[in-house]
Amino acid sequence: MMLAFLLASAIPADVRAQRGGISYPQLRAQNVAPGLYLDHHTIPAPEGEDNVWMSFRFGYDVLQFRRIDEDNRREEAPQSARFMATAELQVQVYKVDAEFDADRLENQRPFKTLNWSGRAYADSFEDTQQATRFLDGFASFAATEPGRYAYRVRVSTDGTNRPLRRNLRRFMVPDFDKPGQQNLSDEAEEGNAFPVYLVEPASDTSATRFQLSSYGRSVMYAQNFGVILQLPEEGQADDYKVVIERLGAQEEQVFEHSLSPSDIREAGMLQIRPQANQSLQIELLEPEAGNQPEYRLAYLEIPNEEFRNSRFMLKLMQGDKLISRREFRNLWIDIPSSLLNIDVALSMMRIIVDDETFNRLRSGNEAERIRKFYAFWEERDPEPEREYNPLMVEFYTRVDEAFDRFSSLQVPGYETDQGKTYIRFGSPQDIERRLPSDGPAREIWTYENREFIFEATTGFGDYKLVDRRTR
C-alpha cells in the first residue's frame, strides 16, 4: 500500500518539534502492552459450590523465557518448543464493608487465598516477545454470603516478583435470590446488584455457551463483542434499554438499544466451565424438567467496530432507573506509538503532506487539533463504515517500523531518507546492495514503477538518497 498520493510538495526533514514536552522516542518506550489481564466473574451457584471465578492472562512479552535443554524438557512440552517460562499468581480475598479502608487489610486475615501456577512454551525467540500470545489461567472459590469483597494480587514470573500498578480491587457478590435488594448505601456500588458479562460474539442466535472475555476489564479495539445482562423479574423486555457512553474529555452517548423479546434468554442456572486452554466459558443451562426458569437474561452483540479507542460505560436502564453497569475500555495491544499523543501523531504527518496542510492541522487548541486530525483521515478512510482506519494505521505502523529499522545514534529512523521512503511507499520489491571498490556502499530499492538509490554516508548504516528513477 503506497501513501505517496498524499504528497503535495517536497517535505522538510525535521519532524522533531513536539508540543507538551514529549517526543516520539519517549512514547515508543512507554508503549508497552499491559502484559497481565485480570478479571472476576460472579454467578449464581448451589450452596457450597464456587460462585466467584478469577480469570487471568499473561502476555508472552512479560514472561521470562529460558531455553529448554533436552535434559530438562518436561513431558508436557511440545516437541517443537525451544523456550519455557513459568508464572505464579496468588489472590488473597477479603470480606469488606462500605467503609472499606485498604490500610486495614494489612492486619486482616484473608477470607480465602488462591494459588495458581502455569507454564508457557515457545518455538522461537521471536515468539517469546509476542504481546499477542498468552498464557491463560483461572481460579475460583465459594463466597459464603452476598456482599462486598476485595482481593489483592501477587504475581511472579520465573521466581521473580513483579510489581503491579493496581494490585487491590473491590467487587460485589450479588444476592441472586433477591437481586437488586442489597443495601447499596455506597453510591459507588450503584448498578452492581446485577452482573454483566463481557463475552465473545455468539456463533448463532440460539447459542447457550459463550466465551468470557480474557482481557481483564477490556475488549479488543475495532472488534465487536457480546454482553450478557441479568434482568429483574418484573417488567417486559421493551421496558429496558442498553446505553453506552464514552468517558473522558469528549463524553457522549455512542449506543442505545431498546430490548426486544428476541434479545431475551431464560435459564435454570448459569455455569462457568473451564476449557482445555484454561479460558472460561459461561453456559446458560435449561431448567430441570417441570421447573420454571430461574433467571432472565439479555444477550446483545455490541458494534464495537464503530467505537473509538477509548473508555466506555455500559448501562442497563429501566426507564430512568439504573439496573446494572459495566465499565470497559478498548484495548489496542499493538497500537502505533504516535497515536498515543495527538501532537506526536500530527508531527509525523509532515512526511506526507505539504507545509500549508501541516501548519493548518497543527493550529488551534487540543480539541481543534484532534478534530482536524480525525477529519483528515476520515476523508481518506477506505472503510468508512468502521472506526478502524486501515490507511491511518498503516501509516503510523510504518513510522514505528522505520524507527526500529533505520535509526542511528543521531537521527531517528523516520527522519532518514530510507525511513521516509519506507513510510511513503512501503517495503520495496527488491533491495540490491553494491560495494564498489572505489566508492561508498549503495542500496537500490526497486518498486513496481520506480527506483530509489541510497549511498552510505558513514560506516554505521546511514544512507542518503542520491537518485530516484521512474521505470
Regions found by a protein language model. Give the residues of each.
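Extracellular recognition modules
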Residues: 152-154, 313-317
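Intrinsically disordered, low-complexity terminal regions enriched in Ser/Thr/Pro/Gly
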Residues: 18-304, 323-332
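Bacterial N-terminal signal peptides
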Residues: 1-9
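Residues within mature, well-folded domains
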Residues: 43-48, 219-224, 233-236, 247-307, ...
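Boundary at the C-terminal end of the N-terminal hydrophobic targeting segment
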Residues: 8-19
